[in-house]
């Protein structure tokens, strides 16, 4: 058998890692917005014997793995520390041999407290061999600056030190999830009625009621066509008969259309599709990477179900919030659309102002857009000027919030999604190519 050719190397090698820090005093609690003396923290470094250098824990993404999942996995493999991610840092790019470029995405990382739900939700990993990582060290930022080999790594360290001094190292995280894909509504009775009442269907039924229909219903033996009695000529339809038949058909079509319009007005609350269920399970890794500990969702089925695997496996709960559902009825029936959107924005603003654990909001439709709009209202600088993100099913918008004397500021926005592939979508794309 002829040997298979080696795969062509990718031009871009994607990697991910984290600058993990902790207080030198284990009893000290991180407070958002509090300035930190760099002498009061330690950073986690790794030594690679192959390159004889000290650097930050990082590594390549595996097949089908998201960047954030790769970052926490690589840190645990190389250091044994289970961490959660905070704000993103500057992406590092440098050339490799063979015309390749390596792109390394970094986040601020913090060790997970013992018993945290994120620890239970992580897949088990094997420690990196000593030929890859032979030493790890917690050290002061001052000493780390002397130990680091690459200039880019030292720039990342300087960024961490500046954030600590300015009270920007400790941030809060708010995630906005677009629920997973839902089932597609099937053709309703109104649609079937519309099809059966079409002019073509009506004319077909009229044509079937001729002489052959009467002979079939006679109950006796079939009569050869040549011996059949001559049919009486049908009188030509009068203009009044034609107008009456047309009016009946028009009434049937109008009635069917009215049923479809009425059905469209009814609130649709589809459950997750088979693909949406897979997305919900794959969200566990993404939410765990950011250490999500609280979850809010609208009462809509997809919003709830998208967080069910994460809550069930991690021992958490999902708080249902009626105000996040713009189709709410009953006591809310008298409230206008703008007032409902205002309540959604107020709920999002409250979450932004809290000094709370990482939180996810699972919201659909216009309510989700209102939440994102409120988050962007708290953004500053380049973040405020960036184009509003459009989320796909199963994607999350991650807002990293700094808390200063003037209130919360969204310092970074990033989008992440599950890497689940939909076979049906790929099949449709393939058929179009061929």
Model regions: which residues?
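Unchanged
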Residues: 61-152
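Acidic, glycine-centered low-complexity repeats within long intrinsically disordered regions
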Residues: 207-216
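A short, acidic, amphipathic alpha-helical segment used as a generic capping/interface helix at domain edges
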Residues: 339-353, 357
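N-terminal strand-loop-strand
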Residues: 2-56, 175, 179
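Conserved histidine-centered catalytic loops in small-molecule metabolism enzymes
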Residues: 288-322, 347, 402-434
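Domain-level recognition of soluble alpha/beta enzyme cores
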Residues: 379-409
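Beta-strand elements within well-structured catalytic alpha/beta cores of enzymes
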Residues: 172-178, 296, 356-371
